[in-house]
């Protein structure tokens, strides 16, 4: 008997993701001007208002208000009717200095013995069901919203689109855990009130709402989904699309009020969207707004890097890696591996974990250096998932009236590189 599995994603205009992107934009600017910055930046967004709070230790000085407004503008909240607009929203800051107690407990004379910024457990996961070693349901959910955002920015078709949106994809698997078909796709997108009722009656309003919904549903199926399918270059995934897919498009009906005006957004409230869509596991720590001394972020990236390279090397078809830390202690307390019975080596999961411990240095400073995490690389991670993205080298320019302008070349999504495959194959005799 097969089973159904579902993952969701949210767009860059979802209020929680607006908050994530602002927090990571603050982090990036501080790292651009002072790579040693210690940052924990939390953001709240609501009707006409942004509130920044958190702890920072840095030599840099940045304009927090300008950073927030630039992010909001880039996302697309540029009209007063959204009740949250880049030029007019208020921006309040309650950011203060990092606790010296924490700082003393983490920093060491030998940088390589830098302690973990907090206790906790972090997970990395990978599966070979997609080319980017991500769960298919989440990969498709992200893709749908990325294409929807492209359509919105082009302003050629579906011109009624607003920034807030969500998607959900349900995949049917067979008994062996192989995807066999796409069962259900849910798309909810914020939109303009683009059809006005003939009069003030409830009947006229209902008719106008139904006409809008009919157009949006048609456009999602006839414009959005063909572009999503065209962006997929994997024959096995393309074969999963079928005429029996159930589409739920704006199933609650009218969706004009949205974004931070519709729901308050907070940093760190989409941790499953950020990672594996419900597959694998999650230690509970959010990523955005945190510099890499916080193992919530850096160790989760390192665990993904390990799991992806292990699966790509052929050690297993699917792998979960857990690593845990004590605050102020450099070396992890444990490394745990689960191959879900899909290993291709004659070793127990515990034995595989011991080989991983020999191959990968999981001290926080070693992770920072291996994955180049002391660079301004984080705003790009804050929408459409931190995992499964394409590593790339980009040039980023930062503007500051206080520090001057600065251009840096950085490598994004380094934890997605398959740069340990050969070492792993040698270690496991593959």
UniProtKB/Swiss-Prot annotation:
| UniProt protein name | S-adenosylmethionine synthase
Keyword vocabulary terms for this entry:
ATP-binding, Cytoplasm, Magnesium, Metal-binding, Nucleotide-binding, One-carbon metabolism, Potassium, Transferase
Which region ranges are annotated with the description Flexible loop? 98-108
Gene coding for it: metK
**InterPro entries attached to this UniProt entry:** ADOMET_SYNTHASE_CS, S-AdoMet_synt_C, S-AdoMet_synt_central, S-AdoMet_synt_N, S-AdoMet_synthetase, S-AdoMet_synthetase_sfam
**Catalysed reaction, written as an equation:** L-methionine + ATP + H2O = S-adenosyl-L-methionine + phosphate + diphosphate
Assembly, in brief, is:
Homotetramer; dimer of dimers.
Gene Ontology molecular function, alphabetical: ATP binding; magnesium ion binding; methionine adenosyltransferase activity
Q: What GO CC annotations are associated with the protein?
A: cytosol
Q: What does this protein do?
A: Catalyzes the formation of S-adenosylmethionine (AdoMet) from methionine and ATP. The overall synthetic reaction is composed of two sequential steps, AdoMet formation and the subsequent tripolyphosphate hydrolysis which occurs prior to release of AdoMet from the enzyme.
UniProt organism field? Bacteroides thetaiotaomicron (strain ATCC 29148 / DSM 2079 / JCM 5827 / CCUG 10774 / NCTC 10582 / VPI-5482 / E50)
